[in-house]
Amino acid sequence: MRWTAGYRLMLTAPVNKIIPFSNVDGPGNRTSIFFQGCPFNCLFCHNPETIHLCRSCGACVASCPAHALSRDDTGVVHWDSSKCVQCDTCIKTCPHDASPKVRQMTVEEVLREVKRSAPYIQGITTSGGECTLQNEFLIELFTRVRAMGKTCLIDSNGSFDFEADPRVLAVCEGVMLDVKAVEPGWSDQLISHPRDTVLKNLDCLLRVGKLYEVRTILFPGRDRENEETVRYVAAHIQDGCFYKLIRYRPFGVRERYQKLLGEDETDVKYAEGFAELARELGAKKAYIV
């Protein structure tokens, strides 16, 4: 948080990156805002650099070929975007699943970037990391964006209890929810977090009409776990809700977890079989990617 000259407290949030135009984060062309920080540690995470905040350990500074990173007298790492060539050497070097390129931004600063794309987008999607860690920030941001005539979607891992605090749902069009596993043991192993809040959110979002899409990853060699999750989700969601079944791909997964999950990607025909099962059970908008 920051104080303005008039002593008004301003909300800030750690932003990993902002993609001006995306056609894979909800309906239409959208600006996607990725916040830093996530309470999960999913084995299959493709962007683990968004999990933790930078500790300023300094490991990345010497590795930067563009000299875009430095440390001040207190040891804090600073990123110079004007020098950065986006090679991501710093991210590959970081031993803490973090990034030195995170910006602490106010709602006004985020809006300024959204407005540049406003004539060409249908709305914004907030993601991460886990964007709901910044709940108060989202409420203000969404209120301002909707005043521009744009829509707002949340991409969430389901860790935030929407039923306990539904305020953000009142200012957004819907949620794209990850349901990664329903079997307790597999869930604990896969995401290092209990599944209870996720499944509670599935019911809550359906009940209030705010569930836009559910996403599940299909893993090779995990027939029972895949089927259990697909059956559970398909039996719950409504016809109007999209169900995205994502084929596991090892590219981008941390090496230490590739050995646990396997080095083969999920076969297309294998995945399509689960999509067909989901459609038979009522999830008419099930599809694979």
Where would I find each of the regions flagged by the language model?
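Conserved AdoMet/S-adenosylmethionine-binding subsite of the radical SAM
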Residues: 108-257
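FAD-binding FR-type
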Residues: 82-83, 103-111
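Iron-sulfur cluster-binding cysteine motifs and their immediate structural context
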Residues: 43-53, 59-77, 89-104
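Auxiliary Fe-S-binding modules of radical SAM enzymes
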Residues: 2-27, 220-289
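N-terminal pre-triad scaffold of radical SAM enzymes
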Residues: 15-59, 76-86
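Short Fe-S-cluster ligation motifs
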Residues: 67-75, 83, 87-97, 112-130
